[in-house]
């Protein structure tokens, strides 16, 4: 089993895009199999996602960090300016934090989160969105000081309307 001390967290580069896409898709398939249709999860395409991650890595205001072990990337996070209508200048949003299922429960997500939070100016408001049925993620974010602030939205994912909950940390 992997241990957090065997994992390095570093800024992502465009050459990481395909590996990030593979982790992204494996995580979605593992985490959302009870929430999203199998047809949608099986349709997720590495090359398409890699293009999105290449753009994210080069975006000026976005920070993408990769967690990797001796085999390669096992997790990543993406953080940038908060996109919500009620966001104040300087508010941040965690757009994504995903781990390959083989890294679940190893402490790598905790270390990624700590790295993100340690990189923020004290007092910065941070938000993120979680699918309503994703109890594992909600528990993880609560442990890191995030709370559901009552804001919800409906996003269509895989042809299905799904409720997302906003969690915030001040």
Task: Identify the meaning behind each predicted range.
Residues 2-3, 164-170:
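Terminal substrate-recognition subdomain of acyl/acetyltransferases
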Residues 82-86, 150-156:
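A short, acidic/glycine-rich surface segment
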Residues 3, 7, 11-17, 22-35, ...:
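Acetyl-CoA-dependent GNAT
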Residues 104, 128-138, 154-160:
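Conserved beta-strand-loop-alpha-helix junction that forms the acyl-donor binding cleft
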Residues 110, 133-150, 162:
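Conserved active-site alpha-helix within GNAT-family acetyltransferase domains
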Residues 120-130:
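Conserved GNAT acetyl-CoA-binding A-motif
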């Amino acid at each position: 089993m992997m241990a957090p001390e065997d994992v390095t967290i570093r800024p992502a580069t465009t050459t990481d895009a395909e590996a990030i896409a593979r982790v992204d898709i494996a995580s979605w398939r593992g985490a959302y199999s009870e929430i999203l249709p199998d047809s949608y999860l099986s349709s997720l395409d590495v090359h398409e996602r890699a293009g999105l991650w290449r753009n994210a890595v080069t975006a000026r205001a976005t920070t993408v960090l990769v967690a990797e072990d001796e085999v390669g990337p096992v997790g990543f996070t993406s953080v940038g300016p908060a996109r919500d209508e009620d966001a104040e200048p300087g508010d941040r949003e965690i757009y994504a934090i995903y781990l390959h299922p083989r890294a679940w429960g190893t402490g790598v997500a905790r270390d990624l989160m700590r790295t993100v939070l340690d990189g923020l100016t004290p007092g910065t408001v941070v938000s993120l969105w979680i699918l309503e049925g994703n109890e594992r993620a909600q528990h993880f974010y609560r442990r890191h000081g995030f709370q559901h602030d009552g804001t919800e939205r409906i996003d269509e994912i895989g042809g299905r309307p799904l409720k997302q909950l906003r969690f915030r940390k001040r």
